[in-house]
Structures are given as C-alpha cells and as structure tokens.
C-alpha cells in the first residue's frame, strides 16, 4: 500500500500527468491504474523474493545447527573415546576449541572485503574441513588439535555473521520476531540431532573408538554441512545484494566506541553465566546425582523442545516492548532460575531432598538453565539499538563474542573453586547476582531515552 501511494504522489507531481488530468481525465485515470498495478506487482515480486531468501537462510543455518549436533556438540566424547585424555589434557584441549571465539573478531576484520554470505560460506567450509579430517583421516594428537581449531573457528565466525544476515532479512520492526523464529527452528534441529545421536550410540551405529579410523557421526556432520553450504550458495546467487558487507571505508580496524560499553558489559556477563549452562548445570546431574550421559542427553532433548517454543516468544516480546524491557525480563527470569537452582542444589547437598524429589528439582533446574540461553537475542537487539550505523553491528557482535569467551575461560577456575570449597549452591547465587547488571543497563537505557 505504501508503494502504491508513493507512486500516485509521484505521478500527480509530474507535469505530464497534471496535463492529462486536466485535459483528458479519463485516460489519466486509466494510466494511473495501469502504473499502480505494475508497481504493485513489482512490490509483490520483491516481497516474494525476500520471503524466498528467508527460507533459504533458515534452511542453510538450521542444517548447520543440525550438523553441529553430530560434530562439535559431542567433541568431548570424541576426545575421551579416541584419545583417552585425562582431566588435565581435557582442560588443555579447551584452548584450541575456545581460542577461535577470541581470534574470530580479528579474522572477520581481516576479511572486511568479504560480504556476509561469503563469510558464512568460508565458515561452513572451515567446519567441513575440520569434520573431514577428524572423521575420516584419524589424525595424530597434535594434528587433531589443529583441526579442532579449524572447525571451531568456522563455528565461531558463523555466530555474529548469522545474526547480521538475519537482521538484514527481517522486516522493519520485526527483527526480534525473525531472530526468535530462527532460534526456534535451530533449537528443533539441535533436538533432532541429539535424539539421533543418542539412538546412534545406544544401538551401535555411531562410535568413538581408538581402533577405528572412521568416526561415523562426524561423517554425517560433514554431509549435512555440505548440504547447508549448497543452500547458502543458492541464497548468495539469488540475492547478491545480501552479500554486500556493511562497513565504513574511512575507518580501519574495529569500530569500538564508548557508547557501546553497555553491550560489552552485558556480553561479558553472558559469558560468565554461560559457564553455568556448559559446566555447572551438567555437574548437578553428573556429580550430585551420579547419573550418566544418557540422562543428560534426555534432559537436553527436553530443554531443546522447551526452547523451540520459548525463543520465538522472546523475539516477539522484544519487537513489542523493546530492548529496555527485554533486559529487565532477562534479569528477573535468569535471576529467578539461578536462585531456584541454588535452592535445589542446597537441598540435594544437605540431604533435605532425596529420591524422586531431588531428581525433579535437579532436572527442572537443568532444563530452565538451558532454556535461559535464548535471552542472548536481547543482546543482539541491544547492539542494533546502540549502533550508529549498520556498519558497526557485525564487527561489534564478533567483538562481543570475544569478550564472552575471554570471561568464560577466565572465570571457570574461580567458579570451580567456589563449587569445591564454598559450596555448589553459591555458584548459582553468583550467577543470579550478576543479573543486576542487566537491570542496571536497562535503567541506563531509560535515562538515555
């Protein structure tokens, strides 16, 4: 409708149309009707093209998430099954696996001449190369670390690039909704992969063994990434304008600014809280309840199912109420979840909860903590709100990812010491306490407005 009104206004301002309207009103009306219809069809065609681009985007990146469920998500089991690593070696292997999260920002900056879709294709290729070597060539221990770094670099570059492409594809005022829709579909892909991995290992279709040169699950990951790469290539071919990288030619290096500090702080807090999701939430099940990986896998499937419904609602909330209220919601919700987890853990360790009761509280705490990860969409929208131009968004998203990883790695030992010497429940109390930062940023946004 907007485009038709714009065309009518343009026609009325032209000398020819005013002449026809005065001298020959009926032909002028016919001409107006024809041009309006033609313009309407053009707008409809453009909208259909954009909708097709969204579908290709969703297929490509959901497939990539699905592939990651067969590869990077179970890499710890690969280390143990194939290389029989001890706890010290496992800790050191976090360096090649997490270092790409820190250096990814510099790689993206160095490839400033590449468009977002080209960067995503490079990322998919890096991931595929890593899965190919690890899954088919049975590398030695040192070479294995190199290709763990390779696949992980691809995985980490994808994160900010994916969000930047999603924001380009979203309609005005619907960015949160589209991000939530993508995250919901991606979570369903992760859930399907988790279920298939569980079945595959339970019935012998998949394995991690030192005496076998082939890793079947990694081979599946390789094939799925190749399919995702195909759909991404089609997206770049059909919508080449989407591959134009937004950056300021006059500025070199990272567009870091003082006004973006609230985003960096919120992202750092997210990195701190991510340790709860990746390390200490599983420890509730594994260490406190002495349950195995199959229990964690089933709980992961339940968490993915819940996330697939929650993530789209978070996106819609952001579009309707804005980033400020989104940060308040994040602060209150995650704070409540961590306090609930602390209460449950205290009950388990003190012996107040036993049997089925302790399992119910532990399982629900684990699921809630996993679902809370989807509030990361609030941080993406915060960066978009603060940015001076679209050129700043992706580079700062990648820098925020680096801040997230640096803090996540540095606090792991501290939180482990708190768990062991102070008490497991205090780890989650700290996670709840830092939620005040989100509330503080929300207050700052209100004053700034």
Put a short name on every predicted segment.
Residues 108-110, 135, 224-237, 341-345, ...:
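Multi-pass alpha-helical transporter architecture, strongest
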Residues 180-197, 401-411:
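Glycine-rich segments within core transmembrane alpha-helices of 12-TM secondary carriers
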Residues 104-116, 201, 310-323, 419:
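Helix-to-loop junctions at the C-terminal end of transmembrane segments
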Residues 112-124, 320-334:
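Cytoplasmic membrane-interface "Motif A"-like loop-to-helix N-cap segments
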Residues 157-170, 373-388:
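Intracellular juxtamembrane helix-capping segments at the cytosolic ends
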Residues 74-88, 279-296:
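Short amphipathic helix-loop junctions that connect adjacent transmembrane helices
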Residues 125-139, 333-354:
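C-terminal ends and interior cores of transmembrane alpha-helices
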Residues 41-51, 235-271:
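Juxtamembrane intracellular "pre-TM" segments in multi-pass secondary transporters
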């Amino acid at each position: 409708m907007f485009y038709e009104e714009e065309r009518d206004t343009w026609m009325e301002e032209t000398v020819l149309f005013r002449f026809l309207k005065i001298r020959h009103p009926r032909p002028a009306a016919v001409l107006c009707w024809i041009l309006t219809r033609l313009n309407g069809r053009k707008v409809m065609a453009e909208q259909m093209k954009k909708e097709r681009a969204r579908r290709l985007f969703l297929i490509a990146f959901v497939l990539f998430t699905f592939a990651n469920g067969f590869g990077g998500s179970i890499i710890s089991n690969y280390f143990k099954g194939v290389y029989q690593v001890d706890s010290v070696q496992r800790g050191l292997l976090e360096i090649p696996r997490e270092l790409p999260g820190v250096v990814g920002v510099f790689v993206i900056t160095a490839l400033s001449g590449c468009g977002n879709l080209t960067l995503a294709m490079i990322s998919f290729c890096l991931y595929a190369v890593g899965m190919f070597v690890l899954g088919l060539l049975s590398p030695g221990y040192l070479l294995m670390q190199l290709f763990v770094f390779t696949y992980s670099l691809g995985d980490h570059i994808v994160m900010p690039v994916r969000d930047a492409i999603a924001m380009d594809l979203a309609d005005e005022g619907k960015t949160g909704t589209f991000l939530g829709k993508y995250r919901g579909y991606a979570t369903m892909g992760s859930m399907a992969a988790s279920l298939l991995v569980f079945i595959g290992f339970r019935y012998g279709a998949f394995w991690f063994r030192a005496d076998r040169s082939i890793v079947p699950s990694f081979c599946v990951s390789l094939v799925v990434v190749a399919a995702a790469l195909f759909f991404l290539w089609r997206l770049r071919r059909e919508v080449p304008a989407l591959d134009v990288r937004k950056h300021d030619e006059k500025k070199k290096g990272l567009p870091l600014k003082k006004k973006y500090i609230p985003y960096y702080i919120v992202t750092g807090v997210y990195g701190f809280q991510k340790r709860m999701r990746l390390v200490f939430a599983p420890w509730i099940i594994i260490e406190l309840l002495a349950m195995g990986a199959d229990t964690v896998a089933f709980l992961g499937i339940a968490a993915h199912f819940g996330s697939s419904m929650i993530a789209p609602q978070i996106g819609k909330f952001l579009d309707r109420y804005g980033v400020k209220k989104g940060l308040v919601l994040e602060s209150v919700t995650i704070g409540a979840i961590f306090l609930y987890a602390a209460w449950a853990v205290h009950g388990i360790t003190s012996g107040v909860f036993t049997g089925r009761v302790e399992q119910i509280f532990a399982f629900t705490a684990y699921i809630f903590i996993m679902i809370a990860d989807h509030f990361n969409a609030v941080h993406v929208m915060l960066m978009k709100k603060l940015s001076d131009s679209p050129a700043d968004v992706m580079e700062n998203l990648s820098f925020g990812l680096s801040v997230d990883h640096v803090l996540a790695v540095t606090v792991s030992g501290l939180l482990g010491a708190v768990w062991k010497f102070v008490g497991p429940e205090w780890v989650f109390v700290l996670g709840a306490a830092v939620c005040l930062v989100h509330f503080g940023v929300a207050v700052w946004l209100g004053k700034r407005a």
